[in-house]
């Protein structure tokens, strides 16, 4: 994911400079204004990725893309063909890294990049990555270049593939390359974001309950410079507001989304939360509920 913002004189993510503030973090979405379990007539699945701009949040689901304001009120949505992945914003467009899952048996799944108008979510273009026999998921944009998480080398493995693509033509820039994250992940880069100086990559790990450093910080040459424990596997982005060298993130997690019996004391909902990376540690700094679903079906 990438974010359209500027802090002071530093323009992040090579997007249009625009100073902005995150709306009240205490905002709580009521059931009346919340996004329901189904958008249109189609089951949308769990959140795959998210990105934000100064006036909107974008969420990628299994087969939907949703745009809301900063209070969770729906602004636009698009139905897509599964399986959706991560999402990022750049230059008036949103991009998703997907895996097309064919309905016909015998046809192989294919990685692709899809592009939508950020205002309306109308599709603009898509490109199947036929040069790559694997998945696509984590995605972000910097200086007009799409950076794409393209899966692991072997299952399980600590080496994952990344690729670079022109944001206008969607044509590849060079060949995919491998990064050794130093630990085993199960699906490669699930979510990817940048602040213009570093890339941040979130992963699923073999042992989900262990305190595995599944959040990787890389420099612009994709050299690993940090590893952290951070549960952001359903989407995150970088937002302004960090002070004294801190990097601030917004991220999304779901509760009871796929199984309402997982935590019966809680409603089915997603949480939009905030965290900061400072002095080598990531800490949750605040949270608010968004998209609570009615328990009555």
Identify the function of each model-found stretch.
Residues 181-217:
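Loop/turn-rich, solvent-exposed surfaces of beta-rich toroidal or solenoidal domains
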Residues 59-60, 103-111, 154-160, 207-212, ...:
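Short, solvent-exposed loop/turn segments at conserved positions within beta-propeller repeat blades
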Residues 72-111:
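Blade-loop segments of beta-propeller domains
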Residues 109-119, 159-168, 212-221, 264-281, ...:
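Beta-propeller blade signature
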Residues 31-41, 71-79, 122-129, 171-183, ...:
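A short beta-strand motif characteristic of beta-propeller blades
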Residues 54-55, 91-92, 143-145, 196-197, ...:
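Short coil/turn segments that connect the beta-strands within blades of beta-propeller domains
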Residues 44-49, 81-91, 131-141, 184-192, ...:
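Repeated scaffold domains used in trafficking and secretory/extracellular systems
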Residues 35-63, 83-86:
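Beta-strand-rich domains and repeat architectures in extracellular enzymes and scaffolds
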């Amino acid at each position: 994911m990438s974010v359209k913002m500027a802090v002071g004189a530093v323009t992040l993510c090579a997007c249009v400079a625009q100073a902005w503030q995150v709306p009240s973090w205490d905002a709580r979405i009521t059931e009346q204004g919340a996004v329901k379990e189904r958008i249109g007539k189609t089951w949308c699945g769990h959140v795959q990725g998210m990105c934000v701009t100064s006036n909107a949040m974008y969420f990628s689901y299994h087969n939907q893309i949703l745009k809301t304001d900063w209070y969770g009120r729906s602004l636009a949505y698009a139905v897509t063909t599964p399986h959706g992945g991560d999402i990022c914003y750049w230059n008036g467009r949103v991009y998703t890294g997907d895996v097309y899952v064919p309905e016909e048996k015998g046809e192989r799944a294919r990685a692709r990049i899809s592009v939508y108008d950020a205002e309306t979510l109308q599709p603009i273009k898509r490109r199947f990555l036929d040069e790559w026999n694997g998945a696509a998921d984590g995605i972000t944009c910097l200086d007009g270049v799409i950076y794409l998480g393209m899966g692991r080398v072997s299952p399980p493995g600590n080496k994952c593939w990344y690729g670079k693509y022109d944001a206008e033509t969607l044509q590849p820039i060079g060949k995919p390359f491998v990064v050794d994250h130093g630990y085993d992940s199960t699906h490669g880069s699930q979510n990817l974001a940048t602040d213009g100086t570093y890339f941040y990559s979130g992963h699923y790990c073999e042992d989900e309950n262990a305190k595995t450093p599944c959040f990787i910080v890389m420099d612009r040459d994709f050299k690993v410079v940090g590893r952290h424990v951070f549960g952001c596997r359903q989407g995150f982005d970088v937002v302004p507001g960090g002070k004294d060298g801190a990097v601030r993130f917004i991220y999304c997690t779901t509760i009871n989304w796929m199984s309402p019996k997982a935590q019966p004391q809680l409603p089915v909902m997603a949480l939009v939360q905030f965290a900061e990376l400072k002095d080598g540690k990531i800490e949750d700094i605040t949270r608010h509920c968004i998209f609570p679903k009615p328990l009555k079906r």
